[in-house]
Amino acid sequence: MKSKPDDRRDNVDRIQQSIDNTIENIHETNEMIENTNREKNKDDLKAKNCRREAALDEFKSEIKDEARAKEKGYK
């Protein structure tokens, strides 16, 4: 059985979509934080957004790497 060749042509687009979705989730969660009175819920939501912020940093680093690889022809 042959393995599929590594097709990275759409990686930058997929990562950008993940960035966009994560930013949207952060905004939605911030709205939930503003609209809840329960401190436990607020703390949980804030922690979730902290993890999302960390993921955004990773996505941004990854998208730079992929863009450089794309310029070099993925070699």
From Swiss-Prot:
It holds the Pfam family Tlp. InterPro entries: SASP_thioredoxin-like. Coiled coil: none annotated. It comes from the Bacteria. HAMAP family: Tlp (MF_01506). Belongs to the Tlp family. This is Protein Tlp homolog. It comes from Clostridium acetobutylicum (strain ATCC 824 / DSM 792 / JCM 1419 / IAM 19013 / LMG 5710 / NBRC 13948 / NRRL B-527 / VKM B-1787 / 2291 / W).
